[in-house]
Amino acid sequence: MAEASSLVGKLETEVEIKASAKKFHHMFTERPHHVSKATPDKIHGCELHEGDWGKVGSIVIWKYVHDGKLTVGKNKIEAVDPEKNLITFKVLEGDLMNEYKSFAFTLQVTPKQGESGSIAHWHLEYEKISEEVAHPETLLQFCVEISKEIDEHLLAEE
């Protein structure tokens, strides 16, 4: 059991953004197909495979460039909480599953207290297939980078 637990991990980061928590959350729930417009070099597309945008149980296929290569991920929306501006995607299939038994992304966006802007909190939970697989720090950095680009895009829309 001790070996298995060393394969399980969590990474978290926070990104300060200028957009409202609601608008930023909305990009991932109602408009994920627009994310590629905000981050054209990183996210190449997002397609609804099954269900409805932003609804629990829906299946979304993301195409993105990570570590210099085009990557595909088929994700299921596991949780959505509009009050908390939270969404969780569980990876079902795709390139990440070559290195991880399980992988989930949670994004929660909270308004800053007493000032404009928000905090985008990314939480990655995963289980590696072996010790040789690196922890996904570069993927966490990818989340930071797309957050900044989406923020700029949302501000330009205003």
UniProtKB/Swiss-Prot annotation:
Give one GO biological process term. defense response
Q: Does the keyword Acetylation apply?
A: yes
Which cysteine pairs are covalently linked by disulfides here? none
**Residue positions of the PTM N-acetylalanine?**
2
Q: Which Gene3D superfamilies match?
A: 3.30.530.20
Q: Which GO terms describe its cellular component?
A: chloroplast; cytosol; mitochondrion
Question: Mind telling me which InterPro entries this protein's record contains?
Answer: Bet_v_I/MLP, MLP-like_ligand-binding, START-like_dom_sf
Keywords per UniProt: Acetylation
SUPFAM superfamilies attached here? Bet v1-like (SSF55961)
Top-level lineage group: Eukaryota
Q: Does the keyword Acetylation apply?
A: yes
| Database matches in PANTHER family | MLP-LIKE PROTEIN 423 (PTHR31907)
Q: Which family does it belong to?
A: Belongs to the MLP family.
**Protein name listed in UniProt:** MLP-like protein 43
Organism of derivation: Arabidopsis thaliana
